Amino acid sequence: MSWQAYVDDHLMCDVGDGNTLASAAIIGHDGSVWAQSANFPQLKPEEVTGIMNDFNEGGFLAPTGLFLGGTKYMVIQGESGAVIGKKGSGGATLKKTGQAIVIGIYDEPMTPGQCNLVVERLGDYLLEQGM
């Protein structure tokens, strides 16, 4: 399966009631884009560095916030292997795997829990596959 198929079929899927993520991507730890949805924001190198720093030392982004394509999200949870950000009625979930970062961005009516489930389910699958 291509990386784009993972984004299209597993991240941008309907989670019920017609709700889908606003955008999604799978990127390498170096920030290279493996696959993304059409409207996923272009990440800046310093944003990827901040994300990787938070995965390596939890809480790194808490004082400054999580930035994705210049948009700031308040970090509400940083747990082992995942970063969750909130912005207004939307937010983002990031899941680190051995080689990649799975990113989902949502807006209402999708809920934070639905976004977390979609992103973490694919992230956990990739971890199980050694990716």
From Swiss-Prot:
Q: Which InterPro entries match?
A: PFN, PFN_euk, PFN_sf, Profilin_CS
GO molecular-function terms, A-Z: actin monomer binding
List localization entries: Cytoplasm, Cytoskeleton
Q: Which SUPFAM superfamilies match?
A: Profilin (actin-binding protein)
Superkingdom of this protein's organism: Eukaryota
What keywords tag this UniProt record? Actin-binding, Allergen, Cytoplasm, Cytoskeleton
Q: Which Pfam families match?
A: Profilin (PF00235)
Q: Which Gene3D superfamilies match?
A: Dynein light chain 2a, cytoplasmic
PROSITE patterns reported in the protein's UniProt record = PROFILIN (PS00414)
Per the record, GO CC terms? cell cortex; cytoskeleton
Q: What residue intervals traverse the membrane?
A: none
Summarize the subunit comment. Answer: Occurs in many kinds of cells as a complex with monomeric actin in a 1:1 ratio.
Relate the protein's function as given in its record.
Binds to actin and affects the structure of the cytoskeleton. At high concentrations, profilin prevents the polymerization of actin, whereas it enhances it at low concentrations. By binding to PIP2, it inhibits the formation of IP3 and DG.
Family in the record: Belongs to the profilin family.
Protein name in the entry:
Profilin-2
Q: Which organism is it from?
A: Parietaria judaica (Pellitory-of-the-wall)
Gene from which the chain derives: PRO2
